[in-house]
């Protein structure tokens, strides 16, 4: 749709779009749509963005591929004019999250989401190992580090790369000044997403936590695991003087210790080729087709494949229920690890609810065949 057509629609007969624009212009926020912490058959039903009339049915779709007039959700006017089509606002209050300890003694996963500027939203998961210190450090300091870089750099991929490297250096200084020797072996994965103007999505990652975009009901993988199984990663480890050894389960580890080749922290393995530089990816969202972004830690990824994650989320009433459903499914499949999921809804949320779910009874046993 052209910019002129969009403005004409806003000024004249486009009641739904006009109302959203007016709400935005008056500075009204969408904090009226409070997400329930979880969804269950026994909990009192609450109206939300995903069931505005309390009917138990999702909102229908208008010809833009975004929510119809039962939703008083504003569009982002400047980006909509810039891109020539309505771009719905992504509200943090509609983001779903869940984190479960599993069978571990401690939950070393961390996650967060925040509005950094008027244009930029932040979402992240961190999966710590060797204690929670590195994950805690990233969870505490990553937002501010990115925020400090945004005025200096337009390219969000560059922003995230610089932020990862700076956080890693700062954690190293912190560890060397500390009397706690365990900090030298503490590390974490990091998968961070920035969303600018509701349409530009940029992902950076180190380790094996993942980001998946559900487009037309199918998963689009936005990250690639950094493991010694990757030829390029293994070659770097060897060139730096490190080695790869396999454990009793046939899983490769750097120097027999770490299952990933990139991380934040793990200071004792820096000279063996474990680096903090992330791989990045930038995509343009299509809200008519894109249902959600989901960030997951490996307690989920090792048990639930990408299509299954999309299917489970698509069957859920709201993102918070979806995040809990995904973590619970990994536990049912037999994971012993911490499980964390962050679900960010986009314009096509609920559009692909008819996706079929294939349940694997063999994986529902505690052993699941993976840990036998």
From Swiss-Prot:
This is Protein phosphatase Mn(2+)-dependent 1K. Mn(2+) 1 binds at residues 127-128. Its EC number is 3.1.3.16, 3.1.3.52. Residues 94-346 form the PPM-type phosphatase domain. Transmembrane segments: none annotated. Mn(2+) 2 binds at residues 127, 298, 337. Keywords: Hydrolase, Manganese, Metal-binding, Mitochondrion, Phosphoprotein, Protein phosphatase, Transit peptide. PANTHER family: PROTEIN PHOSPHATASE. Binds 2 Mn(2+) ions per subunit. It comes from the Eukaryota.
